[in-house]
Regions:
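Bacterial signal peptide processing site
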Residues: 27-30
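Glycine-rich, aromatic-bearing surface loops/beta-hairpins
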Residues: 133-180
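Short structural boundary motif marking the start of a folded domain
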Residues: 33-37
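C-terminal motif of bacterial Sec signal peptides marking the signal peptidase cleavage site
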Residues: 22-25
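Short amphipathic, basic-aromatic surface patches that mediate peripheral association
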Residues: 39-51
Length: 180
């Protein structure tokens, strides 16, 4: 009877060890998880007026950045002509859209653990009298918990950007209250 009991104990231990290895193999090794985000642009009906005062389409360029300091120090033409040279290692990603007057457009990103801010440039006809540049801090990457099999992905956060007649402005953030 003792021999059967010992065999049973070894089988249970082997099953527990196998389960631990399977769960460990499925676990994520990442210590931080990027927070996905969306940028909702809403163009004013009178955006980017031409010489006759008529609204015109406007090009928007979004730069995903490690930090905003280098972006803030560059001029419009350096950012538009060669962003990689102007921003160097600070630049992680770029997106471009063209908004019609009154149009709303959403850009979605999975997030990046290295990203700390986004820089937004609007190609206004009158750069001198417009706020053509805007920086928005991004949510920090979330630390993972020790129970990797119980890990939830962070919820998407949305920033609303108004593309006004002569400038860019943050009008709000949608941060979900539910943690998963």
């Amino acid at each position: 009877m003792d021999k059967q009991r010992a065999v049973h104990v070894y089988k249970v231990l082997a099953a527990c060890l196998a389960a631990a290895l399977v769960l460990g193999a499925c676990a994520s090794t990442a210590r931080r998880v990027a927070v996905p985000y969306a940028i909702s642009f809403t163009a004013d009906a009178q955006v980017n007026p031409d010489a006759n005062g008529r609204p015109s389409p406007i090009q928007i360029t979004v730069y995903e950045l490690k930090s905003a300091s280098t972006f803030k120090a560059r001029d419009y033409f350096a950012l538009q002509s060669n962003p990689q040279a102007a921003l160097g290692a600070e630049l992680l990603n770029t997106d471009q859209i063209i908004l019609q007057p009154g149009q709303t457009e959403v850009i979605k990103h999975a997030g990046n653990v290295d990203a700390g801010a986004i820089g937004i440039v609007a190609s206004y006809r009158d750069l001198e009298d417009s706020q053509w540049r805007l920086t928005v801090p991004l949510p920090e990457a979330e630390n993972t918990n020790i129970y990797k099999f119980w890990q939830f992905s962070p919820n998407e956060q949305t920033v609303q950007i108004a593309v006004n007649r002569s400038g860019l402005a943050v009008t709000g953030w949608d941060r979900p209250w539910w943690p998963f």
